Amino acid sequence: RMEQYLTSVREAEIRTTRADAWLDTPLPTISDADRQRTNRDIAQTMAGDYFRTVYDLMVLAFQTDVTRVATFSLGGEGDAFSIPEIGITESRHQLSHHGGDAGYMEKLTNYDTFAIEQFGHFLTRLTETKDLNGKPLIGSTMALFGSGMSYGHSHGNANLPLVFAGGTDLGLKHGSHIDFNKAAKDFAGYSLGPDGALTSAHYQLCSRPANTDAHMSNLLLLMAQRMGVETDQFGDSNKVIAI
């Protein structure tokens, strides 16, 4: 216990020293183009401009090494705003509780398509922007897009669809779709109904995963390790995903 106490004290000293050093670090110099693109007052009702501006700020922060970690929520799970520019006046939370309404489901699809397009803008900017070593920033950046729910109508939090990009300079390899359900012995596959829609068996996967060993925390553990964190555990992780 004494060793644990001394370790905690030393870690606190290191964090304090790092914070003190940061106070004396001069602000980075940025180009006029970057300043004009990011120094904007944009209302959230202009969702596209708002999303892209925040993504641009994240790219600029990574490029100038102001920070190496950033999180951007497109809106709270309960109050994600509407997107009037594509004809959506409802919040995403409202659309997710669609009750099978075809109009709501179409808007929900359009909402998610719009959101992933803005994430695509972020990846493009990372690809176009050079890091301090003159290499594309995307190579040293890991970008994870997703949600803690796979089916909002019933608050299903399993079988999460995630997009993981970047980090090739960190040894990551992409260009594949990894379906962890297929690794489960009793997984019978995905089935479509007569109308081409997914059956109720699919939606059950959103609450009861076929592969109970597939944890999102396994991916977060991989990301932490590739960032140099010396740890063998992240939350309820049980292995490191091989990518």
Identify the residue ranges that each predicted region occupies.
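Ligand-binding pockets and gating/stacking loops
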Residues: 1-243
